[in-house]
């Protein structure tokens, strides 16, 4: 294992030293895709019998029982008939991999049956079955496919930590995007994408977690740098597999090309084989506006979202709106306006540092704003203080000059010294984890509780320092009541909903990383009337009035029906 981790293995050496694999398909994340879903994916990828498929190359990286392979073989057969070819002309048209010998044997039998049923001879069918299907690990193949036209399939859904240690290390060495607590399918995306020729297409049905979570960031960065996201189809409620799965699946169609327009589709539970042709036709038509049927909705974006950050989620119309706002407006956190998003002070020992009374020098008690102080929508201080070890210059105080503070900390020395921050800096055992910024205390700030169902900005006019369960916004230019009105609106809520993880009960995390995603107009571009309307709505905690004013400010009055969620109703939460 250490040898694998410590050096790059030669291609053949890598697989020969690895642990034997289980013959149980379930342990390999094998879930069978329904035939109509397979046909939908092949249609969307452009792997269709009207093309001369014998001249192209398609890869199925984890063929399992052959759900995709059978359909692909049938299409190659039909294509050869249509183009007056021998089926043997297609000997290089398909390459399928699987780790398990029984799956390889089953797939070869399936291919033979498909081809003989189509009228090809048994020797021809057997030759192609042998050529098309091979036992091997797609992620570690010493001669990986290159310059292929299609990579299609349903890659295995297995946590990387559930793979034997030596094989896991080999996967990480072969696939740099597989970081953190990655799932195995991330490697299939990476290897599949890198196999494509210019213009080649990858089409997978797979869990959609990688689009938003931390371990998918390097894959998102790879896609953004060299590939085009042509299509995403959310299939959360669709019966796409032969058995129930816990993951939320999506179909993604990626192309080795510069990013162009992208289509986003959301399906409903009723979406089935009868609806697939209509969906394919609407996508091929490149409709510039949103399309809606009884079983799906679709919208066309002018481009996809870039970088390694989480890709937004939501209805196609919501995503189209967010894409438009991203293009037209600057980010909330903006150096040109001195607008900054931050988090309150973390102590590592709130029972010691956060109190309503402590026998210390009075100047060491810093008024602290808490989540409960924001509950009503008006800032109402609950009387909590931070027993503050930092002076007015942000330097740790010398306890020899503060006997009462020293005595207080020493009474709690056991709790303070067992914190990680104290272990790293024994001479500063009484520090908080975060340094206090003295300049922040008297600044007006908008406060945001960490967890809430709807966005909940509250104005602290100054004099308090935020606790770590509060995020804050300060600005050199914005009137914070006007900005507070914008951030109380359904537009701001839509940004957070698109990027944040929603917890049980509908609670959202209003963390700095999500608040920074919000786009806002330039302060000077807002009319006096709209400034007054936003400030009045903020003071009244009227999120519906705030949303109405925000729609005008953003120039999206016609899209008010997209904001029927929690932030669109009267009052805060």
Across the structure, where does each feature detected by a protein language model lie?
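Glycine-rich, phosphate-binding/catalytic loops in enzymes
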Residues: 75-79, 111-114, 167-171, 219-222, ...
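A short N-terminal interaction module
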Residues: 1-25
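Conserved S-adenosyl-L-methionine
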Residues: 27, 33-142, 206-209, 219-220
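Signature of N6-adenine DNA methyltransferases within the class I
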Residues: 26-27, 31-40, 63-70, 99-104, ...
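Amphipathic alpha-helical coiled-coil/heptad-repeat segments
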Residues: 489, 526-573
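Short, well-ordered loop/turn elements at secondary-structure boundaries
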Residues: 53-54, 89-94, 128-129, 133, ...
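Polybasic, glycine- and aromatic-enriched phosphate-binding surface used to engage nucleic acids
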Residues: 303, 310-536, 543-545
């Amino acid at each position: 294992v250490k040898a694998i981790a410590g050096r790059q293995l030669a291609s053949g050496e890598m697989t020969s030293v690895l642990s034997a694999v289980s013959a149980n398909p379930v342990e390999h994340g094998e879930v069978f895709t329904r035939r109509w879903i397979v046909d939908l994916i092949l249609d969307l990828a452009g792997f269709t019998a009207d093309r001369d498929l014998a001249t192209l190359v398609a890869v199925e990286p984890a063929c399992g029982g052959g759900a995709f392979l059978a359909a692909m073989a049938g299409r190659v057969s039909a294509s050869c008939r249509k183009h007056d070819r021998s089926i043997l002309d297609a000997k290089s048209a398909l390459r399928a991999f699987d780790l398990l010998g029984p799956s390889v044997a089953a797939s070869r039998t399936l291919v033979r049956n498909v081809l003989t049923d189509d009228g090809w001879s048994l020797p021809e069918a057997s030759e192609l079955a042998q050529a098309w299907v091979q036992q091997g690990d797609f992620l570690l193949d010493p001669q990986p496919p290159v310059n292929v036209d299609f990579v299609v399939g349903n890659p295995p859904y297995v946590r990387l930590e559930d793979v034997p240690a030596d094989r896991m290390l080999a996967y990480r060495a072969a696939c740099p995007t597989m970081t953190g607590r990655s799932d195995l399918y991330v490697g299939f995306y990476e290897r599949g994408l890198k196999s494509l020729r210019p213009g080649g297409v990858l089409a997978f049905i797979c869990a959609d977690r990688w689009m938003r979570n931390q371990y998918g960031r390097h894959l998102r960065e790879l896609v953004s740098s060299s590939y085009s996201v042509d299509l995403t189809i959310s299939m959360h409620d669709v019966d796409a597999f032969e058995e129930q799965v816990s993951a939320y699946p999506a179909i993604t169609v990626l192309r080795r090309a510069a990013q162009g327009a992208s289509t986003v589709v959301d399906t409903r539970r009723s979406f089935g084989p009868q609806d697939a042709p209509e969906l394919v036709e609407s996508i091929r038509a490149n409709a510039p506006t949103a399309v809606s049927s009884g079983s799906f909705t679709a919208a066309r974006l002018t481009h996809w979202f870039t970088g390694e950050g989480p890709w937004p989620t939501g209805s196609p119309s919501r995503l189209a709106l967010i894409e438009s706002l991203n293009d037209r407006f600057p980010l909330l956190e903006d150096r040109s306006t001195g607008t900054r998003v931050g988090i309150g002070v973390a102590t590592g020992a709130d029972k010691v540092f956060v109190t309503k009374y402590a026998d210390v020098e009075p100047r060491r008690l810093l008024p602290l704003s808490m989540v409960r102080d924001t509950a009503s929508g008006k800032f109402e201080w609950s009387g909590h203080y931070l027993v503050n070890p930092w002076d007015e210059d942000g330097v740790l105080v010398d306890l020899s000059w503060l006997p009462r503070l020293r005595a207080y900390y020493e009474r709690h020395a056991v709790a303070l010294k067992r914190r990680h921050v104290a272990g790293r800096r024994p001479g500063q055992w009484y520090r908080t984890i975060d340094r206090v910024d003295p300049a922040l205390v008297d600044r007006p700030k908008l406060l945001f509780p960490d967890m809430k169902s709807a966005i909940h900005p509250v104005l602290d006019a100054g004099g308090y320092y935020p606790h770590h369960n509060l995020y804050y916004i300060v600005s050199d230019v914005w009137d914070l009541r006007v900005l507070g009105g914008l951030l109380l609106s359904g537009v701001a809520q839509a940004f957070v909903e698109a990027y944040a993880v929603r917890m049980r009960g509908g609670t959202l995390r209003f963390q700095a990383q999500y608040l920074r995603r919000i786009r806002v107009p330039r302060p000077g571009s807002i009319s006096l009337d709209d400034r007054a309307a936003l400030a009045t709505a903020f003071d009244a905690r009227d999120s519906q009035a705030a949303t109405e004013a925000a729609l005008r400010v953003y120039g999206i009055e016609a899209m008010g029906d997209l904001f029927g969620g929690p932030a669109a109703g009267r009052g805060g939460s």
